[in-house]
Amino acid sequence: MKNLILSATTAFLLGSVPVYAQGVTLNVPSWMWEEGQVGEWFKRNTADYEAASGNNVSQTQIPAADFEKVVITQIAGGAVPDLMTVFTSMLPPMINAGTLAPLDECIAEGGFGDRLLKSVDFAKVDGATYGVPLTMSPWSAVVNRKLLTEAGIEEMPRTVEELYAAAVAVKEKTGGYGYAFGNDMAAPLHVYINSMQWVLGFGSDWSQPDGTITANDPRNIEAISWLKRFLDEGLAPIGLGIIQARDLFLDGQVAIMFEGPWLMTQVQGEKPEMMADIDFEVVPTPTHAAITGGAFFVIPAKAANPDQACDLLTTYLEEEAQRRWLEDLLQIPGTTAEPSAEFLEENAWVGNMAEIAAQYPGGIGYAPPGYLIEAGEFRQMVVDSLSEIFSGRTSVEEGLNGLQTKLENWSATL
C-alpha cells in the first residue's frame, strides 16, 4: 500500500523550471502561512521563488475557520488573489460560479501533471482542471499511548465500546480525557467534519449521492448518541474549538483524537519529546472511515498575474519541495513523492497513514453527497441541529428527525 501512495522518481524534471516575469507582487491568501512547520515550508519555497523571479509574494494569513467566508467576500469585492489555497469543499461552488481559471495549460507547462494524485479528478469539470491537490492526508486516530498506559490501557481501542471504556479509564485514573474533538459551534466546518467521522464511521451519511436526505438514519442516531454520551459523561471536553482541543493533546491531557497528520506535525514541532509515544492508528468506528478533505491550489479567473501565479505553483510542486512536504511535515503531499529509507525507518507510522488513506478513504471534500454546490448551507443546518442536541435542548432522535424534515423541505426548494 505504501507504494501506491508514496511512489515517484527522485530526479527533478528539467522542464519544470519556469521562466519568470519580473516586477510584480502576487497576492496569495492562505490559512497556512502561520501554521508552524507548514508555514515555514511555504515561506521557504516562496523565498526561493522570489529570489529566482524578482517578484514578491504578499503572504496574506486568514484563519482557517474564517477563510472561506473572508476570501469569497474579498473576491466579490474585487480583491482577487493571484494564487490561493482552498479547502476541497470550496471547489464545487467556486467552479460552478465561474470563479476559477482552468489550470490545464499551467499543468502542462509546469511538467508536474504525471505526478498529481488521483484526487485531482475532484477538480475536473467538463474536461477542464480547476485545481491541483495541495495535500490529501486522511483524518484518523492520533493516539497518546503513554496516557493510555497510565490509565491501564495496553492496546489501542478497536471499537467504539473500547474507546468509551478507555475514556472512562483515562478520566478515572489520570484526570485527563480519553477523547477530544472540536465542538465549538462558532466553527461549523470542524463540527461537521467530526460528525462525518462518526456517521460515516457507522456506515451512513447525512445524505446520499442521489440527493436523498438520511439525517435520521438509525445509524446516524446511534453515532451521534455516542458523541453526546462522551460529552454528557465528561469524557470529552465541552465547547472547545479544534485549536484548543489540539493544545490539550499537546499538553498530554488527551489520549485520542480523530485528527490528521498535521497534529503529528504539530507534536514534532512543539513537543518533539512526545513523538515516541504518539501513533497514527485506524479509527475505532465500525467502518474505520478516514475522512479526507484535503486542500487544493487554485488560480482565480480574474487573477491579475496568472502566469506568475503558475510559476509560483510550479515552484511549490517541484519534486524536492514535495518530498520535503512529506518528510518535514509528515503529511501526504499533492503529488507522488519518494521518501528516503532513513525517513521511513524513523517514521514507521507514515507508512501506516498511507495504508489507512488507501484502505479507508471517505468523505472527500467534507461535502454532503448530492449537495456539493450547496454544501455550506447544508453543513450549517446539520451543525445547528447538533448544537441543539449537544446542549440538551432536544434528544438525539428528536433532533435528527427535525433535521430530516428541515433538510427535505430545503432540498425541495433547490
Say what each PLM segment does.
Residues 31, 224-308:
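Extracytoplasmic/periplasmic substrate-binding proteins
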Residues 68-79, 97, 147-148, 165-169, ...:
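Short helices/loops that flank or line small-molecule/ion binding pockets
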Residues 1-20:
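Gram-negative bacterial Sec-dependent N-terminal signal peptides
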